[in-house]
């Protein structure tokens, strides 16, 4: 008798239906074989399953066991096949048919308990799309899938193998009374250090740049002396970012579930990601990789912020790898037998000093021109060209800082409203256009359709850009930033003031000769 249970294989962020076929025979020497291009981690499931059976007081069949993971031409990796193999083995031993609309997923420990397993969100999404009625996952993974409606599909959180076997025998849902996923049981987000505009004294120009960046998804570079507030400013953008939309939330949850970052909370189902990798981060950690490939920081920042503090300190190879994701909003990772595409539609925020010591242009700077040149060259022209806005940060006057006890910035609520309003305008404008949700996503054809720039404003743009050396890409980035500024002001057309403001974010550069 052949028993087949259902499971999935996760390839990057894609899911593949897997049939777990189990057969027992009394002929030949008793042994346990797994076929279907099983990796080392899948082969090791044999020992985990034997131990789990023993600890659940189940008789392990003293027969020749063959498990086939179909389709057999795909490499199977991970420990998620423990549960479907164990259930198939038990049902084959006891001649129990498993309904075809049930799906199993999870890793077994030696004592029969189910461990947290990456990718449960992708499993439930797959199961819902394919019409599965019952999904069995580790109880420790249920917080990831609180959004799924039980009327469409029942999701059972299983604590141990004995519990699931009891359900197979009785069919009583009360076996899982403590672990059936409840939509109201979302885990709370642990409090994190709060960065807020209300604590920033001065820096109005930088705050305005952050407002524009949040409203239109524009990349932003802060540069200036150390201690001027570049890092705090960048981290404060999280306060004014709008929550994820439903479709964006699903995209982000898939990514974070695949790497196990939804284990302790499901904050990423609503909050936009904010990734802040250290400058020692490796190339693979940044762009993704490994075998099998896993998402890197640029994918973990999808639909959110990637903040590179001290961007000049990152290896040049790592920075150059950002070219394609910044332009195409995805990254391709190729392997011998396959190619993986990970989404990477993020907003880049970066901070840097003008020189190694940070005090270029003052008496405190001891850096030679050669040292400064070598330092600034780490940020190549193509990377700088892909950053929409360049903002110089000055030190705030000490006299103003000394009055910190009387400082009170009440503009934050208005800034949030402005950002939400501008996002709503863009959502309505680009409704039905694939892969475009903000002004920063616009391609050449969309800029022609939606820029709606006044003739007077266009003349100012032509005159200004003829005097400064900019690329074609920079020209259109100025137009897109102008479009966002007009959206923040509630203006249907791009006016002169919007163009003039956008221009100021492109004129300043990391020129070693610039007098800071």
Feature-to-residue mapping (PLM):
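Peripheral, non-AAA+ core regions of ATP-driven protein-machinery
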Residues: 1-221, 225-231, 474-475, 492-516
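Walker A/P-loop
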Residues: 221-263, 328
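Residues immediately C-terminal
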Residues: 110, 306-307, 313-314
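Basic, amphipathic alpha-helical bundle interface domains used for macromolecular binding and assembly
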Residues: 35, 41-46, 59-61, 68-78, ...
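The Walker A (P-loop) glycine that initiates the GxxxxGKT/S ATP-binding motif of P-loop NTPases
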Residues: 224, 288, 310
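P-loop NTPase nucleotide-binding/switch module
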Residues: 173-212, 216, 243-298
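Walker B catalytic acidic pair
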Residues: 303, 309-310, 321
